[in-house]
Structure formats: structure tokens, C-alpha cells
Swiss-Prot record:
GO molecular function: hydroxymethylglutaryl-CoA reductase (NADH) activity; hydroxymethylglutaryl-CoA reductase (NADPH) activity
Swiss-Prot/TrEMBL catalytic activity: (R)-mevalonate + 2 NAD(+) + CoA = (3S)-3-hydroxy-3-methylglutaryl-CoA + 2 NADH + 2 H(+)
Lineage of origin: Bacteria, Pseudomonadati, Spirochaetota, Spirochaetia, Spirochaetales
Protein name: Probable 3-hydroxy-3-methylglutaryl-coenzyme A reductase
Organism of provenance: Borreliella burgdorferi (strain ATCC 35210 / DSM 4680 / CIP 102532 / B31)
Active-site residue list: 85 (charge relay system), 278 (charge relay system), 375 (proton donor)
Length: 431
């Protein structure tokens, strides 16, 4: 399918949430001009999966939900989120409505991949290696034909001597265009290591990519007028001040910062799972960046001006929109079609905004009426579904269970099952 033939965004209907699963699929299919035969998350190509990993025995199903009409840089996006956590998609949809008038925007500079070679040397070779740029570019040219054609390729190098280990580190920075480029970066490291040995006789003890891209970050920001936070002006100001205070706690308490950043990654990791991006590399780099000062800090901050709540985030995002499994897996291909993303830089920007929106939704809930109210409503739905499937509960029993869970403020399957047994025992005694 030609993505350029799509309109600038896929604006889903206002009542999308209330449609059946089949109706939701049909609406998206009609936007994407997919036929009834086209893949839509509800099956798997096991032949493909078999060849992805060793000892394949099956696949794990994750629910995929849609965040609809999140306005980013003036354009609306519908985003697929793969997650097991009940409230992630609901919270992001809620945030999308509020932030529609907040001018949510991202900005980013270059994003480069890094090949690393660690060379055994008691001597500091920095002066020699810093002048190797042209030679290294020639050495790796055969590997970069496709990247050069797309405007990418070798960009620069850096080096430093680790005296304590007797090791010289060499970093090679490469623009991998729309790919994450893991295989390419590893190949470059191995090729350069071979030439260093042949040219200089130095043993290379390690040659591999780095998953740390903390020097290449995306920034996102919104400015939300108080009037869009809550209906009442005074209430909105108070809520914004609470959000500001909760946000600041993470800068003094690492325990809070960890939880704050987990909330940011809820949305980001969900989109990356839906697109078959490497979530381990992504999160490793993000958390390293959060601790770059020697202390673990929040990736985001929220503060107030005279009439608005401002949210900001800075985050490194190592992802791709092409290459590897991404280009061949049907689920990944469909996810990118739904988003109508045209480049890796656009995808990185979207992810930074998704992280900020996820964080905003969580902080607003914490400041307003606690995180459990919305989350538990969805969690209870799961419990009731399981009870319906296993024990065929009636509508009467369902209502009684809901009342009792709310009264006791206990939302667990074990507690619900205990109450169900009590209800049924009471009914038996009445008969």
C-alpha cells in the first residue's frame, strides 16, 4: 500500500471507543484501504516466527489498543499500543482529549548509531586514531552503500584511552537513516577491528554496537491553559499546582523518579512493542540517560506559569521504522500504516510526545483523585470477565461483587471469588 496516498491523518470517529472489536477493525481498514483478506493483528505467520528464534514453540498474545487523535506538531495521530497494563491506553486517550489545545510539539537534532572498538594498548593512541577518519570511512565504504544512497553513512569518530585497563576506545558514529541499524553497526565494528589489527597490529578485545545514545535526544513540550485542565478556574489552578509539586518530588527522591519514568515508558514501550522495535535497547539507553549526573532523575518536568501548566521531556530513543524484523513482520507493517509515519525522526518525535502524554495522564490522576480509580475500573473488568468465563456469574452476582469490592476497596480475583462463594452459599440457604 502506498502511504503517500493516505490523507495527512487518520481521524477516528468520536464513538470509536463504544464500537465492537469488529467495527473498530472495519473503521481502521476503511481508512487504510485494506481488503477483508489483509492481516489485522488477529492471526500470526508461524512460518515467519519459526525462523525468528531458536527452539520456537509458539507466540505470546498481547492486546493492542488504539490511542486516537493525539495531536502532535499540529497533526493528528492514531497510535497502536501493545500492553498488558489495563489503564495505559485509556489514560493516553484521556490525555489526547485534554492536550488537543496544548500545542504538544517535539524537536530533535541528529540521531546517530555508534560502533565501538576496544583496543588493547598501554599507550594512549588518541593522537593517532583521531586522524583516522578518512581511512575508516574508506574501510567501511562497502558496508554503507545503501546508507550513503539514502543520505546516511559515516559521520565522525571519537576516541579515548582508559589508562586503568590499558584499553583504547574508538567510537564510530553512523547515520543509519530509518533503520535502528544494529546489524550494520556490529558489522562496521568488526570490519574496523580487522583493519586496525592488519594496519597497526593492535588486538581488538571488543567490537560491538553501543546501545547508549544519550547524546542524541528528542525533546517534547506542551503548554496547557488552566481552563482545559478542569472546568472550574480555581480548581484547575489548584490541580496544576499539585501536578507541579508531584513532578518536583522526583528530583529529590530517586524512588519517585523511577516510578515517574516507568509511567513515561508505559506509552513509549507500548508503541515500540506494536512496531517490533527493540524495547530492551530502548529502555537501557533511557535509564542510563536518567542517571547521567550520577543520580537518577525524572526524564520530565511539569511547572506552572501565570495561566498554564507546562510539561517538558528530554529523552534518547533508539528505534527504527525500517530494517530487520520491522520491515517483514505483518503486525509491525500494519502498526506503521496506522500511524502514517514517514521517517525515523518523525517516529522518535511521536514517541517523545507519547511519553510526555502518558506521564501527564498519570500525574493528573495522582493529583486529582488517585491513580487507582481509573486503573481499578479496568482491572475489575478483567476480574469479572474471568469469573464470567469460569463460573458463569449472573448480572445480579456481578452487581453484588462490584458493590462489595468498592465498599471494601479490595480489587483482586481472590477477594471477588471469596465474595462470589458467599453470595451463592446465601442463595442456597434461602432455597
Amino acid at each position: 500500500m502506498n502511504l503517500e496516498s493516505l490523507s495527512s491523518f487518520m481521524e477516528l470517529s468520536k464513538n470509536f471507543r463504544h464500537k465492537s472489536v469488529l467495527e473498530k477493525r472495519q473503521e481502521i481498514k476503511s481508512f487504510l484501504e485494506l481488503s477483508y483478506k489483509d492481516f489485522f493483528y488477529n492471526n500470526a505467520n508461524e512460518d515467519f516466527l519459526f525462523n525468528m528464534i531458536e527452539n520456537y514453540i509458539g507466540y505470546l498474545s498481547f492486546p493492542i489498543g488504539i490511542v486516537k487523535n493525539l495531536k502532535i506538531n499540529g497533526k493528528y495521530y492514531s497510535l497502536p499500543i501493545a500492553t498488558e497494563e489495563s489503564s495505559v491506553v485509556a489514560a493516553l486517550n484521556f490525555a489526547a482529549k485534554i492536550l488537543e489545545n496544548a500545542d504538544l510539539r517535539y524537536s530533535l537534532g541528529e540521531v546517530l548509531g555508534i560502533s565501538q572498538i576496544y583496543i588493547k594498548s598501554e599507550k594512549d593512541l588518541s593522537k593517532i586514531f583521531v586522524d583516522l577518519g578518512d581511512k575508516i570511512k574508506t574501510w567501511i565504504e562497502p558496508l554503507l552503500t545503501n546508507m550513503n544512497q539514502r543520505g546516511g553513512g559515516f559521520r565522525r569518530l571519537s576516541t579515548r584511552h582508559i589508562k586503568e585497563l590499558g584499553i583504547q576506545k574508538l567510537n564510530i558514529y553512523v547515520d543509519t537513516c530509518d533503520a535502528m541499524g544494529a546489524n550494520l553497526l556490529n558489522s562496521i565494528a568488526e570490519r574496523v577491528a580487522e583493519f586496525i589489527f592488519l594496519e597497526f597490529g593492535y588486538e581488538c578485545v571488543l567490537k560491538v554496537l553501543s546501545n547508549d545514545i544519550s547524546e542524541f535526544t528528542a525533546k517534547a513540550r506542551f503548554v496547557l491553559d488552566f481552563k482545559h485542565l478542569l472546568p472550574g478556574k480555581e480548581d484547575s489552578w489548584n490541580l496544576a499546582k499539585k501536578i507541579e509539586l508531584i513532578s518536583s518530588i522526583g528530583f529529590y527522591e530517586e524512588e519517585r523518579a523511577v516510578t515517574n519514568n516507568k509511567g513515561i515508558m508505559n506509552g513509549i514501550t507500548g508503541v515500540c512493542l506494536a512496531t517490533f522495535n527493540d524495547t530492551r535497547a530502548l529502555e537501557a539507553s533511557v535509564h542510563k540517560f536518567a542517571s547521567k549526573s550520577g543520580k537518577y532523575f525524572p526524564l520530565s518536568k511539569f511547572y506552572t506559569t501565570d495561566n498554564a501548566l507546562v510539561g517538558e521531556i528530554e529523552i534518547p530513543l533508539q528505534v527504527g521504522t525500517k530494517g530487520g524484523v520491522i520491515s517483514f513482520n505483518e503486525a509491525s507493517i500494519l502498526s506503521f500504516k496506522i500511524m502514517n509515519v514517514n521517517s525515523k525522526s518523525e517516529f522518535i518525535g511521536i514517541l517523545s510526545c507519547v511519553g510526555l502524554a502518558s506521564n501527564f495522564a498519570a500525574l493528573r490522576a495522582l493529583a486529582f483523585n488517585g491513580i487507582q480509580k481509573g486503573h481499578m475500573r479496568l482491572h475489575v473488568n478483567k476480574i469479572l470477565h474471568l469469573l464470567k468465563t469460569k463460573y458463569n456469574i449472573s448480572d445480579f452476582e456481578k452487581d453484588k461483587l462490584l458493590l462489595e469490592m468498592e465498599r471494601m476497596n479490595i480489587y483482586s480475583f481472590d477477594f471477588a471469588f471469596k465474595i462470589l462463594k458467599k453470595i451463592r452459599l446465601e442463595n442456597e440457604n434461602k432455597v
